Structures are given as C-alpha cells and as structure tokens.
C-alpha cells in the first residue's frame, strides 16, 4: 500500500514539472541592489533576455517573486520551445544551434525536437550544460530576443492582470515569445 502511494507521488512529481520562460522587460536604471543581484543570478542582465528554468528548481519561485516587477514569466509549450531553440539558440562563438550539433554533443538523435522534449520533462537543464574541461557552454542558457513586433499591449510598469506586461502570465507567454523571435 505504501509503495503504491510512493509510486503515485513520483508520477505526480514528474507531471508537475513545468518549464518557466522568464523574460526581462524593464531595463537597468533605478533597480534595487537586491533585485539586481537576483536578476544577475537568473542571468537576466539586459532587457529582452530570456532564460528557461524548471519549476522544480529549489528557490526559483522565491527568486521570481523578488523580481516580479522587472520580468514576465509563464509556462512555455513545446512548439514555442522548438522555435526558440532553432531561431535564437546559440552555442559558444555565437554560432546558431543546429540539429547536427545537438546530435554530436548531447547524443540526442532527434536533434532539437528531442532536446525540447527532454527540457520539458526536466531530464536536461539548460543552465547545467557547461563543459568544465573546456570552460565553455555547450548551449548558451540565455536567449537574446527582439522587442515584440507590434509593441507591448500594455504598460511595462503594471502587472499583467491589471493591463500591463509584468509578472506571471501563464501560457500567454508563448504568444509574447513568438512576437519577440
């Protein structure tokens, strides 16, 4: 009976893994030092930079809550993730991410699509793909985006729920990412 409950909890834990896409919306001026430090830890150094973190990462919820007035975040879907990796994914030397590179370095025969699936399941964490011997990123953990086509729909000083752009937006982040690619 207890073993069945543990197996059920493991299944629930695997289903609850969400991949957060976090985008810095506001700039560097007048940022509180604590917030600036947290943005640095999240690798969000400039406007329109995007990072991907799993929801199961310890402390990620508290870090996002601290910087909620400078970023927007939500759960990224598979199609948007594949398009993001193809169009904005970079490797060391600022070269574009390709299927051949993923197959060679990570051993994933499905290329970028398989990488996206493993990222969504939480099997691979983008921020941990670092080659310590060569001291280079296998895949850079930061995606540099354009400002959104058509501009922002609301103020970048108000929360998303109040007609602005900041804070949690759930699956609506995918539409914003597609406009910024």
Curated annotation (Swiss-Prot):
Q: Which CDD domains has this protein been placed in?
A: Ribosomal_L7_archeal_euk (cd01657)
Give the record's keywords alphabetically.
Answer: Ribonucleoprotein, Ribosomal protein
Report the InterPro entries cross-referenced here.
Answer: Ribo_uL30_ferredoxin-like_sf, Ribosomal_uL30, Ribosomal_uL30_arc, Ribosomal_uL30_euk_arc, Ribosomal_uL30_ferredoxin-like
Q: Does the keyword Ribosomal protein apply?
A: yes
Q: Does the keyword Ribosomal protein apply?
A: yes
Q: From what superkingdom does this record's organism come?
A: Archaea
Query: GO CC annotation: what is one?
Result: cytosolic large ribosomal subunit
Give the UniProt family note. Belongs to the universal ribosomal protein uL30 family.
Quaternary assembly? Part of the 50S ribosomal subunit.
Q: What is this protein called?
A: Large ribosomal subunit protein uL30
Source species of the chain: Hyperthermus butylicus (strain DSM 5456 / JCM 9403 / PLM1-5)
Taxonomic lineage of the native organism: Archaea, Thermoproteota, Thermoprotei, Desulfurococcales, Pyrodictiaceae
